[in-house]
Amino acid sequence: MAITEEQVKHVAKLSKLSFSEEELADFTNQLDKIIDMVELLEEVDTTGVPFTSNVNESINVMREDVATPGMDRKELMRNVPESENGYIKVPAIMDNGEAGA
């Protein structure tokens, strides 16, 4: 099953991506090779091979929750570009109706 440039354009549009004609051709070629490899894997006879959903034998390995000292607050605050009332001040990324965002 080959993939077409139209299919790649469609997926790119859904992903809000845009490609040049050269990039489109490159991605189409790469995706076509990937599909060929998957089709090749589908032909492998796995009869008698046990199903494994997790190859790692460890199950629910937990560690004790231990509090450890963090970085010294004064040392940390020396490295921040801007602070206010003991907190690190960062630029607003959402506008909630207040000035500055």
Curated annotation (Swiss-Prot):
GO terms for biological process: glutaminyl-tRNAGln biosynthesis via transamidation; regulation of translational fidelity; translation. The keyword Signal does not apply. It is an enzyme of class 6 (ligase). GO terms for molecular function: asparaginyl-tRNA synthase (glutamine-hydrolyzing) activity; ATP binding; glutaminyl-tRNA synthase (glutamine-hydrolyzing) activity. Its EC number is 6.3.5.-. Pfam families: GatC. InterPro entries: Asp/Glu-ADT_sf_sub_c, GatC. It comes from the Bacteria. Keywords: ATP-binding, Ligase, Nucleotide-binding, Protein biosynthesis. SUPFAM superfamilies: Glu-tRNAGln amidotransferase C subunit. It catalyses: L-glutamyl-tRNA(Gln) + L-glutamine + ATP + H2O = L-glutaminyl-tRNA(Gln) + L-glutamate + ADP + phosphate + H(+); L-aspartyl-tRNA(Asn) + L-glutamine + ATP + H2O = L-asparaginyl-tRNA(Asn) + L-glutamate + ADP + phosphate + 2 H(+). Belongs to the GatC family. Allows the formation of correctly charged Asn-tRNA(Asn) or Gln-tRNA(Gln) through the transamidation of misacylated Asp-tRNA(Asn) or Glu-tRNA(Gln) in organisms which lack either or both of asparaginyl-tRNA or glutaminyl-tRNA synthetases. The reaction takes place in the presence of glutamine and ATP through an activated phospho-Asp-tRNA(Asn) or phospho-Glu-tRNA(Gln). Heterotrimer of A, B and C subunits. This is Aspartyl/glutamyl-tRNA(Asn/Gln) amidotransferase subunit C. The lineage of its organism: Bacteria, Bacillati, Bacillota, Bacilli, Lactobacillales. The gene is gatC.
